[in-house]
Amino acid sequence: MADVVAAQYEKWIYPQPIMDLAEYCGKGMTDGVAPHYLHPLFWPDGEYERREGKINILVAGCGANAAARYAYQHPNAQVTGIDLSEASLNHERYLQEKHQLDNLSLRQLRIEEVSSLGQQFDFIDSVGVLHHLPNPEEGLRQLKTVLKPNGVMGLMLYGLYGRVGVYMLQEFFHRLYLQQTEGDVAVVKETLTQLPKAQLDRLRFTELSYDAGL
Protein backbone atom coordinates (compact mmCIF):
# COMPACT_ATOMS: atom_id res chain seq x y z
CA MET A 1 0.00 0.00 0.00
CA ALA A 2 2.80 2.40 0.87
CA ASP A 3 4.39 1.90 -2.56
CA VAL A 4 1.09 2.70 -4.28
CA VAL A 5 0.73 5.86 -2.20
CA ALA A 6 4.33 6.88 -2.93
CA ALA A 7 3.84 6.37 -6.68
CA GLN A 8 0.66 8.45 -6.62
CA TYR A 9 2.31 11.42 -4.91
CA GLU A 10 5.37 11.24 -7.15
CA LYS A 11 3.09 11.65 -10.16
CA TRP A 12 0.68 14.14 -8.62
CA ILE A 13 2.20 16.53 -6.09
CA TYR A 14 -0.11 17.00 -3.12
CA PRO A 15 -1.43 19.24 -1.81
CA GLN A 16 -1.52 22.01 -4.40
CA PRO A 17 1.89 23.69 -4.18
CA ILE A 18 2.10 27.09 -2.52
CA MET A 19 4.38 29.35 -4.54
CA ASP A 20 4.88 32.17 -2.01
CA LEU A 21 4.59 31.66 1.74
CA ALA A 22 4.59 35.39 2.49
CA GLU A 23 1.53 35.87 0.30
CA TYR A 24 -0.17 32.73 1.61
CA CYS A 25 0.44 33.39 5.30
CA GLY A 26 -0.32 37.07 4.80
CA LYS A 27 -3.92 36.05 4.18
CA GLY A 28 -4.08 34.63 7.69
CA MET A 29 -3.61 31.04 6.55
CA THR A 30 -1.97 28.66 9.00
CA ASP A 31 -1.97 25.02 10.08
CA GLY A 32 -4.90 23.94 12.19
CA VAL A 33 -2.74 22.74 15.08
CA ALA A 34 0.16 25.19 14.77
CA PRO A 35 1.92 25.84 18.11
CA HIS A 36 2.45 29.53 17.38
CA TYR A 37 -1.20 30.21 18.18
CA LEU A 38 -2.33 27.08 20.07
CA HIS A 39 0.59 26.97 22.51
CA PRO A 40 -1.56 28.16 25.48
CA LEU A 41 -3.63 25.00 24.98
CA PHE A 42 -0.68 22.68 24.38
CA TRP A 43 1.58 24.02 27.13
CA PRO A 44 -0.61 25.90 29.63
CA ASP A 45 2.33 26.16 32.03
CA GLY A 46 3.92 28.74 29.70
CA GLU A 47 6.80 26.55 28.52
CA TYR A 48 6.48 27.74 24.92
CA GLU A 49 6.82 31.40 25.93
CA ARG A 50 9.71 30.68 28.28
CA ARG A 51 11.56 28.99 25.44
CA GLU A 52 10.63 31.81 23.05
CA GLY A 53 9.25 29.28 20.60
CA LYS A 54 12.57 27.43 20.38
CA ILE A 55 11.08 23.97 19.99
CA ASN A 56 11.80 20.96 17.80
CA ILE A 57 8.99 20.25 15.32
CA LEU A 58 8.44 17.17 13.15
CA VAL A 59 6.05 17.29 10.21
CA ALA A 60 5.42 13.62 9.42
CA GLY A 61 4.06 13.40 5.89
CA CYS A 62 4.79 17.01 5.01
CA GLY A 63 3.68 16.90 1.38
CA ALA A 64 4.55 19.87 -0.81
CA ASN A 65 4.15 22.71 1.67
CA ALA A 66 3.63 21.92 5.34
CA ALA A 67 7.21 21.67 6.60
CA ALA A 68 8.23 24.93 4.92
CA ARG A 69 5.06 26.57 6.21
CA TYR A 70 5.86 25.49 9.77
CA ALA A 71 9.43 26.76 9.43
CA TYR A 72 8.20 30.09 8.06
CA GLN A 73 5.65 30.62 10.83
CA HIS A 74 7.90 29.32 13.62
CA PRO A 75 11.22 31.07 12.90
CA ASN A 76 12.73 30.18 16.30
CA ALA A 77 11.88 26.48 15.96
CA GLN A 78 13.85 23.72 14.29
CA VAL A 79 11.58 21.96 11.80
CA THR A 80 12.07 18.54 10.22
CA GLY A 81 9.84 17.41 7.37
CA ILE A 82 9.62 13.81 6.17
CA ASP A 83 7.67 12.43 3.23
CA LEU A 84 7.66 9.50 0.80
CA SER A 85 7.44 11.73 -2.26
CA GLU A 86 10.66 13.20 -3.61
CA ALA A 87 8.58 15.39 -5.93
CA SER A 88 6.81 16.93 -2.93
CA LEU A 89 10.09 17.37 -1.08
CA ASN A 90 11.54 19.16 -4.10
CA HIS A 91 8.80 21.77 -3.83
CA GLU A 92 9.51 22.07 -0.10
CA ARG A 93 13.13 22.76 -1.07
CA TYR A 94 11.97 25.44 -3.49
CA LEU A 95 10.12 27.18 -0.65
CA GLN A 96 13.09 26.67 1.66
CA GLU A 97 15.42 28.43 -0.78
CA LYS A 98 12.92 31.15 -1.72
CA HIS A 99 12.31 32.14 1.90
CA GLN A 100 15.79 31.28 3.26
CA LEU A 101 14.43 28.83 5.81
CA ASP A 102 17.64 27.87 7.59
CA ASN A 103 15.60 26.25 10.37
CA LEU A 104 14.22 23.55 8.05
CA SER A 105 15.58 20.11 7.20
CA LEU A 106 13.93 17.62 4.84
CA ARG A 107 14.22 13.85 4.48
CA GLN A 108 12.65 11.26 2.22
CA LEU A 109 11.60 8.82 4.90
CA ARG A 110 8.75 6.55 5.92
CA ILE A 111 7.00 7.28 9.19
CA GLU A 112 7.80 3.73 10.27
CA GLU A 113 11.50 4.66 10.08
CA VAL A 114 11.24 7.95 11.95
CA SER A 115 13.49 6.77 14.80
CA SER A 116 16.41 6.81 12.33
CA LEU A 117 16.37 10.61 12.58
CA GLY A 118 17.91 10.26 16.03
CA GLN A 119 15.88 13.17 17.40
CA GLN A 120 13.18 13.85 19.97
CA PHE A 121 10.45 16.37 19.19
CA ASP A 122 8.39 18.81 21.22
CA PHE A 123 5.64 18.84 18.62
CA ILE A 124 4.65 16.40 15.87
CA ASP A 125 2.21 17.25 13.09
CA SER A 126 0.77 14.41 11.01
CA VAL A 127 -2.33 15.49 9.12
CA GLY A 128 -4.14 13.15 6.76
CA VAL A 129 -1.29 10.63 6.70
CA LEU A 130 -1.55 7.76 9.19
CA HIS A 131 -4.64 6.21 7.60
CA HIS A 132 -2.65 5.67 4.38
CA LEU A 133 -0.11 3.42 6.11
CA PRO A 134 -0.30 -0.39 5.87
CA ASN A 135 -0.47 -0.40 9.69
CA PRO A 136 -1.61 2.97 11.06
CA GLU A 137 -1.24 1.85 14.67
CA GLU A 138 2.41 0.97 14.08
CA GLY A 139 2.98 4.35 12.48
CA LEU A 140 1.49 6.04 15.52
CA ARG A 141 3.64 3.94 17.84
CA GLN A 142 6.76 4.99 15.94
CA LEU A 143 5.81 8.66 16.18
CA LYS A 144 5.30 8.25 19.91
CA THR A 145 8.87 6.94 20.28
CA VAL A 146 10.27 10.29 19.08
CA LEU A 147 7.89 12.50 21.07
CA LYS A 148 9.34 14.16 24.17
CA PRO A 149 7.64 13.41 27.52
CA ASN A 150 5.95 16.83 27.57
CA GLY A 151 5.46 16.85 23.81
CA VAL A 152 2.28 17.31 21.82
CA MET A 153 1.08 15.47 18.73
CA GLY A 154 -1.44 17.00 16.31
CA LEU A 155 -3.18 14.36 14.18
CA MET A 156 -5.94 14.34 11.58
CA LEU A 157 -7.53 11.13 10.34
CA TYR A 158 -10.33 10.77 7.84
CA GLY A 159 -13.75 10.67 9.51
CA LEU A 160 -16.46 8.37 8.17
CA TYR A 161 -19.46 10.67 8.44
CA GLY A 162 -17.71 13.81 7.27
CA ARG A 163 -16.58 12.04 4.08
CA VAL A 164 -19.51 9.73 3.38
CA GLY A 165 -20.18 11.39 0.00
CA VAL A 166 -16.53 10.96 -0.99
CA TYR A 167 -16.57 7.29 0.00
CA MET A 168 -19.70 6.68 -2.08
CA LEU A 169 -18.00 8.16 -5.13
CA GLN A 170 -14.80 6.22 -4.47
CA GLU A 171 -16.80 2.98 -4.37
CA PHE A 172 -18.47 3.91 -7.66
CA PHE A 173 -15.11 4.62 -9.32
CA HIS A 174 -13.64 1.39 -7.94
CA ARG A 175 -16.49 -0.53 -9.57
CA LEU A 176 -15.53 1.11 -12.86
CA TYR A 177 -11.96 -0.17 -12.33
CA LEU A 178 -10.54 3.32 -12.75
CA GLN A 179 -6.77 3.61 -12.35
CA GLN A 180 -4.33 6.46 -11.70
CA THR A 181 -4.12 7.63 -15.31
CA GLU A 182 -4.80 10.97 -16.93
CA GLY A 183 -7.68 9.45 -18.87
CA ASP A 184 -9.35 8.09 -15.75
CA VAL A 185 -8.89 11.41 -13.95
CA ALA A 186 -10.75 13.00 -16.86
CA VAL A 187 -13.59 10.50 -16.32
CA VAL A 188 -13.76 11.51 -12.64
CA LYS A 189 -13.88 15.20 -13.57
CA GLU A 190 -16.68 14.63 -16.08
CA THR A 191 -18.64 12.57 -13.55
CA LEU A 192 -18.43 15.35 -10.98
CA THR A 193 -19.92 17.81 -13.46
CA GLN A 194 -22.99 15.56 -13.71
CA LEU A 195 -23.71 15.39 -9.99
CA PRO A 196 -26.80 17.16 -8.63
CA LYS A 197 -26.00 20.53 -7.06
CA ALA A 198 -27.07 19.33 -3.61
CA GLN A 199 -24.56 16.49 -3.80
CA LEU A 200 -21.80 18.80 -5.03
CA ASP A 201 -22.48 21.20 -2.17
CA ARG A 202 -21.71 18.36 0.25
CA LEU A 203 -18.40 17.76 -1.53
CA ARG A 204 -16.99 21.27 -1.38
CA PHE A 205 -13.42 20.23 -0.72
CA THR A 206 -10.75 22.44 -2.29
CA GLU A 207 -9.00 19.22 -3.37
CA LEU A 208 -11.63 18.70 -6.06
CA SER A 209 -10.29 21.70 -7.98
CA TYR A 210 -7.02 20.05 -9.12
CA ASP A 211 -5.90 16.64 -10.36
CA ALA A 212 -3.80 15.61 -7.35
CA GLY A 213 -6.74 16.26 -5.05
CA LEU A 214 -8.99 14.02 -7.11
Named regions from a protein language model:
Residues D122-E137, M153, G159:
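A short SAM/SAH-binding and catalytic strip from SAM-dependent methyltransferases
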Residues S85-A87:
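Conserved SAM/SAH-binding beta-strand->alpha-helix loop
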Residues E137-G151:
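A short glycine-rich, Lys/Arg-flanked "PGG" loop and its adjoining helix->strand segment in the class I
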Residues E112-I124:
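A short acidic, Gly/Pro-enriched loop at the edge of an enzyme's catalytic core
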Residues K11-I55, R69:
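Conserved alpha-helix/loop element of class I SAM-dependent methyltransferases that forms part
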Residues V152-T206:
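Conserved class I S-adenosyl-L-methionine
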Residues G63-N76:
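Conserved SAM-binding loop of SAM-dependent methyltransferases across substrates and taxa
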Residues K98-E113:
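Conserved SAM-binding strand-loop segment of SAM-dependent methyltransferases
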